[in-house]
């Protein structure tokens, strides 16, 4: 398995080997599906949309609803405004959405389609019901990643739909490209703190809705469009992820004077402390004892298990916002990051992670815009005890005989992980348990018969 991966790196400027990211439209579709009765529309070919839906469906084990402009060779050359107009008429007639969220693809961006102008024509020609709300985001696949696409779509929601009116006393939460289980955990924390909130996009009952047997075109979840409109009147905004949702928080602050706190992603003790304190300050509430108890239990867990993971070398890869949180957590656990790699290019990410690791580990590699081939090369030169990341690390895991803790997107070879949080004190506790017990499983596997103990 991967036997011919060389240890020494060769400079590569125009080729990626085994990407550590996916494309912008996937993030845009995921964000759009977090809005109630919203139909994501891919302004591209049927093949583009099939790929997006496949990636989301394989991770979440749920159907990902979306439509397409169905580009062909001819329309790609001569223009596709007629396709988009026909698609909007068809999807409003058949699917009857409240909101349509259009994102572009490589071909649409390459031929220079101006979606905004086409939508003006749709309005002027009265092709669809004017009560249906439409927004559009530019999401070319050859720039950025799924994180960029998510950020662009949420930014489009805010710039298109928000309306200033009277204060609502609520706190905005922009989750980022995170799992439904994480959003549900954040909402639970806010409920304990008795904070009224507007969470958008909210995928908790979209990818993770209960199976009731009741028919329906759209899942019951998602943020109502009225809540997004009302987000301009909130007491503050917390973007859990700097790169996925931070732009929308800045727009709300700049345009409507809604105070914004952007990051850090609440994974681990310190980052969750920051989130809880930011929420308490913006909403002007006290931190309840129940959360203090949760924090105390997490500290107790980490203390109990620390001999099993302290000093262990770890390689982490995935989305940048999740990686900053995971890096903070493993540093709190006393582990040693050898490499932290994301496929999304960002100098801010590199600076933040380097600041978390600090001078204690000057040999650590922090890479943005990297790929899985680079990750493997580094691990071959600097062996690790544990991998933390998505499904695509399993090949490196087998090749180097290193255990893998699956975290992030996509995870297509294990079931139900998206239901459980990694955020908050409860999420960190779950990660601590998984990391410690994965290392203990490896210790048992490698132990000779005379060292196989019932007590660790």
Swiss-Prot record:
It holds the Pfam family Oxidored_nitro. InterPro entries: ChlB/BchB/BchZ, Nase/OxRdtase_comp1, Nase_comp1_CS, Nase_Mo-Fe_CF_bsu. GO terms for molecular function: ATP binding; iron-sulfur cluster binding; metal ion binding; nitrogenase activity. Its cofactor is [8Fe-7S] cluster. Keywords: ATP-binding, Iron, Iron-sulfur, Metal-binding, Nitrogen fixation, Nucleotide-binding, Oxidoreductase. Its EC number is 1.18.6.1. One of its GO terms (cellular component) is molybdenum-iron nitrogenase complex. It catalyses: N2 + 8 reduced [2Fe-2S]-[ferredoxin] + 16 ATP + 16 H2O = H2 + 8 oxidized [2Fe-2S]-[ferredoxin] + 2 NH4(+) + 16 ADP + 16 phosphate + 6 H(+). One of its GO terms (biological process) is nitrogen fixation. Binds 1 [8Fe-7S] cluster per heterodimer. It comes from the Archaea. [8Fe-7S] cluster binds at residues 23, 48, 106, 141. This molybdenum-iron protein is part of the nitrogenase complex that catalyzes the key enzymatic reactions in nitrogen fixation. Belongs to the NifD/NifK/NifE/NifN family. Tetramer of two alpha and two beta chains. Forms complex with the iron protein (nitrogenase component 2). This is Nitrogenase molybdenum-iron protein beta chain. It comes from Methanosarcina barkeri. The lineage of its organism: Archaea, Methanobacteriati, Methanobacteriota, Stenosarchaea group, Methanomicrobia.
């Amino acid at each position: 398995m991967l036997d011919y991966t060389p240890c020494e790196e060769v400079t590569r400027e125009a080729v990626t080997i085994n990407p550590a990211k996916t494309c912008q439209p996937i993030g845009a579709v995921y964000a759009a599906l977090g809005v109630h009765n919203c139909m994501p529309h891919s302004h591209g070919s049927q093949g583009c949309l099939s790929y997006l839906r496949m990636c989301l469906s394989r991770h979440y084990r749920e159907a990902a609803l979306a439509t397409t402009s169905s580009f062909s060779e001819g329309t790609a050359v001569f223009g596709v405004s007629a396709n988009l107009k026909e698609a909007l008429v068809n999807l409003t007639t058949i699917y009857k959405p409240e909101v349509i969220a259009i994102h572009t693809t490589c071909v649409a961006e390459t031929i220079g389609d101006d979606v905004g102008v086409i939508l003006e024509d749709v309005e002027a020609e009265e092709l669809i019901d004017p009560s249906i709300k439409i927004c559009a985001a530019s999401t070319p696949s050859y720039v950025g990643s799924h994180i960029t696409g998510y950020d662009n779509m949420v930014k489009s929601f805010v710039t298109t739909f928000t309306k200033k009116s009277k204060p609502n006393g609520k706190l905005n939460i922009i989750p980022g490209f995170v799992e439904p289980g994480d959003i549900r955990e954040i909402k639970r924390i806010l409920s304990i703190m008795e904070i009224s909130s507007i969470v958008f996009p909210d995928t908790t009952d979209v990818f993770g809705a209960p199976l009731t047997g009741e028919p329906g075109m759209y899942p019951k979840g998602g943020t109502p469009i009225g809540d997004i409109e009302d987000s301009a009147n909130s007491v503050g905004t917390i973007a859990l992820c700097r790169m996925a949702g931070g732009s929308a928080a800045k727009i709300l602050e700049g345009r409507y004077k809604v105070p914004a706190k952007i990051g850090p992603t609440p994974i681990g003790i310190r980052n969750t402390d920051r989130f809880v304190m930011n929420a308490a300050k913006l909403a002007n509430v006290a931190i309840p004892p129940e959360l203090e108890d949760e924090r105390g239990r997490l500290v107790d867990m980490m203390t109990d298990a620390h001999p099993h993971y302290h000093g262990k070398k770890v390689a982490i890869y995935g989305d940048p916002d999740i990686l900053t949180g995971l890096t903070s957590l493993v540093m709190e656990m006393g582990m040693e990051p050898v490499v932290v790699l994301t496929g999304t290019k960002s100098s801010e990410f590199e600076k933040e992670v380097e600041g978390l690791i600090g001078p204690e580990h000057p040999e650590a590699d922090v890479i943005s815009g990297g790929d899985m081939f680079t990750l493997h090369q580094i691990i071959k030169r600097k062996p690790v005890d544990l991998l933390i990341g998505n499904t695509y690390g399993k090949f490196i895991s087998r090749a180097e005989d290193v255990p893998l803790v699956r975290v992030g997107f996509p995870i297509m070879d294990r079931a139900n992980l998206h239901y459980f949080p990694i955020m908050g004190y409860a999420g960190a506790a779950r990660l601590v348990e998984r990391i410690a017990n994965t290392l203990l499983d490896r210790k048992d596997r490698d132990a000779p018969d005379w060292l196989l103990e019932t007590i660790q």
